[in-house]
Amino acid sequence: MAKKAPDVGDYKYGFHDDDVSIFRSERGLTENIVREISNMKNEPEWMLDFRLKSLKLFYKMPMPQWGGNLSELNFDDITYYVKPSEQAERSWDEVPEEIKRTFDKLGIPEAEQKYLAGVSAQYESEVVYHNMEKELEEKGIIFKDTDSALQENEELFKKYFASVVPAADNKFAALNSAVWSGGSFIYVPKNIKLDTPLQAYFRINSENMGQFERTLIIADEGASVHYVEGCTAPVYTTSSLHSAVVEIIVHKDAHVRYTTIQNWANNVYNLVTKRTFVYENGNMEWVDGNLGSKLTMKYPNCVLLGEGAKGSTLSIAFAGKGQVQDAGAKMIHKAPNTSSTIVSKSISKNGGKVIYRGIVHFGRKAKGARSNIECDTLILDNESTSDTIPYNEVFNDQISLEHEAKVSKVSEEQLFYLMSRGISEEEATEMIVMGFIEPFTKELPMEYAVEMNRLIKFEMEDSIG
């Protein structure tokens, strides 16, 4: 008998487990909490200093005055560190039973066996499971949780950590820098190309929880890697905060693809800083799927520093009742003959709000640079809204910039055509939406495309009538 595929759609039901943590910090953000986190991790002195300086920056920096409403986000109500187990296990059988049951529901063991070169699973503040194929280690590839990389690869770690996203970048980058825990660290040596993805899962289980993973990826000259992350959390009446930082360095002739499929519950603030430095003839691809959350503010950024560097963002955002998806991309052209592409697909229903917010910058040295932007929004009812807010900065006259934006509704003609062939209105609307997101799903590995379609179908429930 065929085994049932892991159903990421189960996230929709917001299951959560009993608290199995072995340590939980007090609520609120203080210097003592920051010191406690660093002490529990047995970190070097320079990292504690970095955290404390970041905390001071966080206190000084203002809240963003644009994007979604953050007035209900209470930093004193959040638990900043929860340790779910003693250590990250390399055998699935050794993961604590309660935690293992959660990830079993999400299909992680089966996904690892079938599709992946390496897997990391983070539960609350810490990675609880981590494994990588032995042959990849033999090639010199490093794939660890970020805390382990700090301890075991300190020189390499220190060279790149906070070099792309400094603590002073924005208030939530400063917050992450003060209390970061977990995340993935990847180093791919020169000319090594991974054919199968590395993957991480991030799960918030507790109420009023803050998750602050820090991911750092370095693709050395001529290297290639695809990293996939999935994110989920159960439904609570009070708010949780996910505030990650992702830093990526794409060296000469290297290629990185970073795929995100998030399905946070609608009580989660998802406030993330993602940025990459791309050097000569390097290629960075962001593939970004944003479902769920109360508010998402996320703008994957490519800084194109070397001649011929390429950057692209392909994103989809789905906003339902009570949700705001404020997402987009930033492309910063700093070198000649660089190129960038932004394709943004947004869907809103039941009063949801989607906002595309993007920046394309052409510096004085970016002669011959070019950028293409496409923003398409599908609005499913009269209560939902969409805004497109592009911002372009041009400091030389030898560039090419194209921008196309389109807002549409499901047309009566489309529905009539499909319904005249015996298809119900609900099924017809679903088919139109699936066609709309197809440019996104076709870029996903097959198993993720299937799950993305399932998630969209769950989101589409009750969209008719």
Curated annotation (Swiss-Prot):
Domain of life: Bacteria
BP GO annotations: iron-sulfur cluster assembly
InterPro entries: Fe-S_cluster_assembly_SufBD, SUF_FeS_clus_asmbl_SufB, SUF_FeS_clus_asmbl_SufBD_core, SUF_FeS_clus_asmbl_SufBD_sf, SufBD_N
Short name of any one Pfam family annotated for the protein: SUFBD_core
Recorded family membership: Belongs to the iron-sulfur cluster assembly SufBD family.
Protein name per UniProt: Iron-sulfur cluster assembly SufBD family protein SAB0778
